[in-house]
């Protein structure tokens, strides 16, 4: 039986849709994750703590499901975005300098060997995220099924 938490305007919504906590989720390959993620979701808004060990998949740019503010609390990384011709441009992101990003902004993160820790403050999701292969959006499951996960132990 599913527990129901009742709030004004939130009657009959399962508790897990209103409030969730997730601890140290490994992202990527379990034996060598590229990222560990801690997540707090309250009424659709999300706060995340990320411990970056390796870079995002650099083969293609991706977007996100929501607008976000990213704050590096330890380390640094490069936020790589496409220019008007789709060529990558690297921007250094440093600790304690908040960065706002719209959900539709295509990018990937290039993480140095030292790794990085970030806090993400996320809006409610409103956009289906994916990878842009030859300017065509591929949803994550289809993308990884076709191209595989490349963040192995020797990937940086």
Spans of features found by a protein language model:
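Ligand-binding loop in jelly-roll beta-barrel domains
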Residues: 102-128
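Short acidic-glycine-tyrosine-enriched beta hairpin
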Residues: 81-108
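Conserved short histidine dyad/triad with adjacent acidic residue
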Residues: 46-64, 103
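Active-site or metal-binding loop neighborhoods of secreted/extracellular toxin and effector enzymes
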Residues: 129-156
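Acidic/serine-rich, low-complexity amphipathic helices located in mid- to C-terminal regulatory regions
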Residues: 99, 113-121, 133-142
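Short, conserved beta-strand element in jelly-roll/cupin
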Residues: 63-78
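A short, N-terminal "cap"/entry segment at the start of jelly-roll beta-barrel domains
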Residues: 1-46, 88-89
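A short secondary-structure junction signal
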Residues: 50, 81-83, 110, 128-134
């Amino acid at each position: 039986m599913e527990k129901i938490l009742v709030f004004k305007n939130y009657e009959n919504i399962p508790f897990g849709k209103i409030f969730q906590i997730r601890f140290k989720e490994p992202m990527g390959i379990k034996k060598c994750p590229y990222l560990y993620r801690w997540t707090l979701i309250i009424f659709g808004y999300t706060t995340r703590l990320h411990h970056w060990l390796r870079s995002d998949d650099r083969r293609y740019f991706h977007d996100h499901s929501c607008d976000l503010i990213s704050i590096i609390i330890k380390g640094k990384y490069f936020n790589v975005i496409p220019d008007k011709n789709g060529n990558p441009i690297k921007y250094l992101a440093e600790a304690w300098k908040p960065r706002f990003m719209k959900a539709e902004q295509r990018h990937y993160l290039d993480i140095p060997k030292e790794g990085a820790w970030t806090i993400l403050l996320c809006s409610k999701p409103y956009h289906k995220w994916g990878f842009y292969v030859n300017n065509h959006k591929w949803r994550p499951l289809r993308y990884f099924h076709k191209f595989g996960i490349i963040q192995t132990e020797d990937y940086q």
